[in-house]
């Protein structure tokens, strides 16, 4: 009897001694009745017809290959694969949520802001005609409206030639100026000379170099603005494309093996190894990671474009000061009115039925000396500062695609590599294989992940990124070029204050009008660019913690109290054996 007691105490002491060493303990054996598996699977698929009552050989399984009896059937395996792919898509969308929200909101803000600029520029131009040339007002309003409508369409991508827009504006204005200002007494019988006057406008350069100046300014500023909006819209397309990728069957099998095959053995609380997750994600997302190089170039090229968007490359500065340049062009016509009237009288004589008396008015009559006076305005938030703010936020996502595999693993339940974890086949103490890097240029030790080229949809989005990057580089202004004398002379001849932030131009009338150049009216936009409160942004940040709290740890170290109790029992048994 004493021998039996001594033997029992020795066994207890040995087991407790192993516990005192702090080694991780294996989980309890699987449920022999598949009860836990049935309960869990019912959450994914209502009904239990596919779940065996007791473990089965599982000879028909293709992914969760059993080493013994299993609680999974082929139908369950298929459901797990579908669920794994859906989980992957949701994780991708969660990863891109903040970035996607940032670009979508800014694209909407800037598009509407540019429309506001166009609307204000049209109003300023109409006000200039009303205050200085009331006789031209009805027709001028129509021509100005058509011009700025074309400007809006061009910004949105319409196939309109900027030079044609400007030429049409001046071609339409000159006949009105000639018949209403230079020859207001022109008989009705000779008013059919409009086509001749339109042609004479270009041949005689009646507006001097002002049309060419406006072409240069408007063309440069609108091209940059148009590319800027196109780039933002492409950014949205890139994110949408990667958000809804359809992963290969090989990837689906690997995800299933990592996340669900442990359930077939009744190991419901076991987590995949962190290193194993990294390898699987690197393989599944190898094609997506190929986007990284072009995505980085996209953000840097967009930054370079934004840095050059001022003065004649800033549509706010150009369009909001356009009324002053048009006013100067009309003054030029007035100054040369006598000579022009004589020349045009001869040029368009075939269109005139009889001689008429020239009623040219002196140049000072229509000149408002206040037109170029400057009213300085205090600094407020501008579109320029908004653009710079956007770039700074985008740069925080410059490694977005290369960091995606790590993000997915960090936001899904995985076990650290120094704990008991699931390696796709069984429980292991430590997963030693390192995750491969650099996309598809490396080989993996997982035969399921066949190295192929990027999916066609990924290849297409890469081609689009290459194209927009080339456009951005082409349109970007080399550093310092905007300050060159030639460009200053070309872009700031007519009424520019020349300040990078607050630009202003005086107007005629009872005093100076503050021009809201560098948009001081952003408050009109009902948008908020702060993405900190983006829907779901606060949720996915704590996703990992929530998942951890809902799962039990595997192989935890014994608590200090348990160790003390074990030591006490061990010592008691030792003294019993000795005595």
Curated annotation (Swiss-Prot):
Propeptide residue intervals? 554-579
Q: Which residues are glycosylated?
A: 123, 240, 417, 494, 508
Q: Record's Pfam families?
A: Glypican
Q: Which GO terms describe its biological process?
A: animal organ morphogenesis; anterior/posterior axis specification; body morphogenesis; bone mineralization; branching involved in ureteric bud morphogenesis; canonical Wnt signaling pathway; cell migration involved in gastrulation; cell proliferation involved in kidney development
Region annotated Disordered sits at 533-552
The text of the family note is: Belongs to the glypican family.
Query: What biological function has been recorded for the protein in this entry?
Result: Cell surface proteoglycan. Negatively regulates the hedgehog signaling pathway when attached via the GPI-anchor to the cell surface by competing with the hedgehog receptor PTC1 for binding to hedgehog proteins. Binding to the hedgehog protein SHH triggers internalization of the complex by endocytosis and its subsequent lysosomal degradation. Positively regulates the canonical Wnt signaling pathway by binding to the Wnt receptor Frizzled and stimulating the binding of the Frizzled receptor to Wnt ligands. Positively regulates the non-canonical Wnt signaling pathway.
Q: What is this protein called?
A: Glypican-3
Q: Identify the species of origin.
A: Mus musculus (Mouse)
